[in-house]
Design a protein with these regions (language model features):
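Beta-propeller folds
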Residues: 17-20, 24-469, 474-475, 483-485, ...
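Serine-hydrolase catalytic core recognition
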Residues: 269-270, 324, 332, 338, ...
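Generic detection of intrinsically disordered/low-complexity segments and helix-coil linkers/edges
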Residues: 9-11, 58, 67, 147, ...
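Bacterial N-terminal signal peptides that target proteins for export
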Residues: 2-13
Length: 775
């Protein structure tokens, strides 16, 4: 890569298309120091960074009790540092909310209690008949069949279903006793309790299986065995990871029927993942332009036998189509099914009769770019009206429809996004939702009447609120964080949201047993890009900052669809690593380019038919802004990112105008032909009809000996199911052909996210050392 000549650097300060509109700090957020900062107190080391949980780890596992009185979640307990052979185990913690549902809180907030200890979890999942000792080779989750994956409340909220990798146990809270429901050495997944609380369902051997809670009778399959590539109620990798479908089957509200998705992967391409011991396993990996799964939906009475025929829902020919969502209506007879064409530009919402299989289309959405699938569909109790979200006007908003497809009301309006439809309280005529109305950098809980009137914000603290509303819609669990506040859980009454929380965590959800260190302030910026769009960015400056000095800069990249780097939220381990590097004397800079989330569909559209182009143009504008700052050392620019961010890092290191000296790329996509069809075709369309866009989107477009002069390190898990190892190998092969090379940090048998503590420590240590050495 050629160095950006000094005349261009000098000219950058007069580029009128790149101006700072505001050093706009969030309300309550420090705008940045006017005089040098003292060094922050509190130890911040690589070990401390690697111990920090992912920012949303606890929120994913949260479950309200059916009576809406207690909320519980998983929390990982690490074994003592000097223990041998002991692996981490999940515990279940809970917060009781003893206040009457509609009463204001009184007295001090309630503190969390340990509901099920790690020892009890392990004993319950192991069962009396299983071996009590085994060899443990590492801390990877897959090596521990007794690790708690999830849990569910019983209908009477007196017990918990403990869900392991191979076993299910029924745990009685009052006595602390448990009994085994399902055991064995074969994996199981997607366990759930029927709405009437009498049956547990799960997937084993690619098919639906049921077991009685009371009798503990032998598990029975709802369907006969099928071909190993025909999944009955089980999700394949694309549907689980690209459409984020929670489960491949659903109980009817009265527990009389089960609807499931049949996924036929027989014609779909497979990819082989090879472990360090020479064993291999295949995963379904539909490639662009190739075959995609053939999907159908069936319904069957829960009490029927495997030999009884199910009802097939009449969706017409489904080859070349996706069915990304389906759900029951409250009446227990009808299903709502979303049908999406392969180009992902036409989405139909279909009403299906579960008894006859007949269907009718309720509404159709069309978009010339692509349609983003969401979970925003809730039916009212009469099963004749529903709330639905759409981005048809450029921003996602809520609409009230009837099942004949008539729009009854538009509930929300404005140049902001509804990010989640939380709940409907029909008794009050209120819809609860999460949105960016206050700022794209924040998210808050709101309510609005079913006629679209009286929109009210229910959360006050500046930052990010992720609300989980309780059954009965009396209170909500609020996962709150900001750039300087680790994630905390508060339980708040919906009738008194401005009052003190009725319950809260005492120390937040930071690393167990560790207080968060004091942090350097984050300055939020609004930058106007060269084509007129406005981008959000942030700066973190070193302690004792002196504007008369020159500082190196690390540009952190995320940049992909659905991602948002610049937001007032706790950043987890990555955010702490940025703080660590700032303490070491680096300025940290991040910018959300066009194509990222929370700014509306208009802001996403410029990446259509070309990935990496608009994103890098916007990131170059960010660098040009940095060049206007007198305290930035323009010859010492580094870049770092993971996944899509890693893809952009490789682009950046080969980008002709910008002289990045060092780049750290985690799991970078090198060629989108290697990626799964659902994601790649959504943005690039057909690889034959739009071959030029596909070719231009490769990270190696500008590779040549002339344009690669910096230091590049690539980190990759060898069993990464998202970004396959062939990407990293192709990059190194092409670099060698050009007479160049990159440093590679391989994590054997690890996936896309490096999760086990020893490997996380190595990852953050190598990232840190790489920039200290090369920048």
């Amino acid at each position: 890569m050629t160095q950006l000549n000094r005349s261009l650097l000098a000219a950058a300060s007069v580029f009128v298309f790149l101006t700072v509109l505001a050093p706009a700090a969030m309300p309550g957020q420090n705008r940045g120091p006017e005089k040098p900062l003292a060094a922050p107190s509190g130890a911040l080391t690589v070990e401390r960074v690697s111990a920090e949980p992912d920012a949303d780890e606890r929120a994913r596992s949260l479950h309200w009790s059916p009576d809406g009185v207690r909320v519980a979640w998983l929390q990982l307990r690490q074994p003592p540092a000097k223990s041998r052979g002991e692996v981490p185990q999940q515990e279940i913690w809970a917060i009781p909310s003893d206040a009457p549902p509609n009463a204001p809180p009184a007295g001090p907030p309630r503190e969390p209690i340990l509901l099920v200890s790690a020892e009890k979890v392990t004993a319950s999942l192991r069962g009396s008949d299983a071996p009590r000792h085994r060899r443990l080779d590492d801390d990877d989750d897959n090596s521990n069949p007794y690790l708690l994956r999830n849990f569910a409340w019983s209908r009477d909220h007196s017990s918990l279903l403990l869900i392991g990798a191979q076993s299910l146990a029924w745990f009685e809270i009052a006595t602390g006793s448990s009994r085994t429901l399902v055991s064995g050495d074969q994996p199981l997944s997607d366990a759930a309790i029927s709405p009437d609380g009498k049956t547990v369902s799960f997937i084993r051997d690619h098919t639906l299986t049921l077991v009685s809670v009371q009798s503990g009778a032998a598990a029975r399959t709802l369907l006969p065995p099928a071909h190993e590539d025909i999944l009955e109620g089980e999700l394949d990798w694309p549907y689980r990871n690209e459409f984020h479908l929670a489960r491949g089957y659903e109980w009817s509200p009265d527990s009389s029927r089960i609807a499931w998705l049949e996924i036929d992967d027989r014609a779909v391409a497979k990819y082989s993942l090879r472990s360090s011991n020479g064993e291999s396993r295949e995963i379904v990996s539909p490639k662009a332009g190739g075959e995609i799964p053939v999907v159908r939906i069936f319904v069957k009475r829960a009490g029927s036998g495997a030999e009884d025929s199910p009802v097939e829902i009449d969706l017409g020919p489904t080859k070349g189509l996706y069915l990304p969502r389906f759900t029951w209506l409250p009446d227990g007879r009808h299903l709502a099914i979303q049908r999406l064409n392969r180009r992902q530009q036409t989405l139909e919402l279909i009403l299906a009769d579960a008894v006859t299989g007949k269907t009718q289309t309720m509404l159709t959405e069309k978009d010339q770019y692509w349609i983003n699938i969401s979970d925003d569909l809730r039916f009212l109790g009469d099963s004749k009206r529903f709330v639905w979200s759409s981005q048809r006007a450029g921003f996602r908003h809520l609409y009230l429809y009837d099942t004949d497809g008539k729009q009854l009301a538009q509930l929300t309006h404005g140049d902001w996004e509804v990010t989640h439809l939380n709940a409907i309280d029909e008794s009050k005529g209120l819809v609860y939702f999460t949105a960016t109305e206050k700022s794209p950098l924040e998210s808050h809980l709101y309510s609005v009447h079913l006629d679209g009137s009286g929109m009210t914000r229910l959360t006050a603290m500046p930052g990010t609120h992720e609300a989980h509303i309780a059954p009965g819609v009396a209170s909500f669990a609020d996962f709150y964080s900001s750039q300087t506040t680790p994630t905390r859980l508060n339980i708040v009454s919906l009738d008194h949201p401005d009052q003190t929380a009725v319950a809260k965590t005492s120390s937040g959800f930071s690393a167990p047993g560790q207080s968060p260190p004091s942090l350097l302030p984050v300055e939020f910026l609004n930058l106007k890009l060269h084509l007129g769009a406005e981008a959000h960015a942030f700066l973190i400056k070193p302690p004792a900052f002196d504007s008369a000095k020159k500082y190196p800069v690390i540009v952190y990249l995320a940049g992909g669809p659905g991602e948002q780097l610049v937001r007032d939220a706790w950043g987890g381990a990555t955010g702490l690593w940025m703080q660590l590097m700032a303490r070491k004397g680096y300025i940290i800079f991040g910018l959300d380019n066009q194509g990222t989330a929370a700014r509306g569909h208009y802001f996403e559209e410029p990446i259509h038919l070309r990935l990496g182009g608009q994103e890098m143009a916007d990131q170059r504008d960010g660098v040009l802004y940095l060049n206007t700052l007198p305290y930035v050392d323009t010859m010492r620019l580094g870049v770092c990112g993971w996944g899509y961010g890693g893809f952009l890092v490789v682009h950046a290191m080969l980008d002709r105008p910008v002289p990045f000296k060092a780049g750290f790329a985690g799991a970078p996509v090198i060629d989108w032909h290697f990626y799964d069809a659902i994601f790649a075709e959504r943005y690039l369309d057909d690889p034959v009809a739009h071959a030029d866009g596909w070719d231009a989107s490769t990270a190696l477009e500008n590779l040549s000996p002339t344009f690669f002069k910096g230091s590049l390190m690539v980190a990759q898990g060898t069993e990464d199911e998202v970004v396959h190892l062939e990407n990293a190998l192709t990059l190194q092969d092409r670099l060698l052909d050009a007479g160049k090379s990159a440093d590679f940090l391989l994590f054997p048998d690890r996936g896309h996210v490096i999760e086990d503590p020893p490997s996380r420590l190595v990852l953050f240590s190598r990232m840190t050392d790489f920039f200290v050495k090369n920048l």
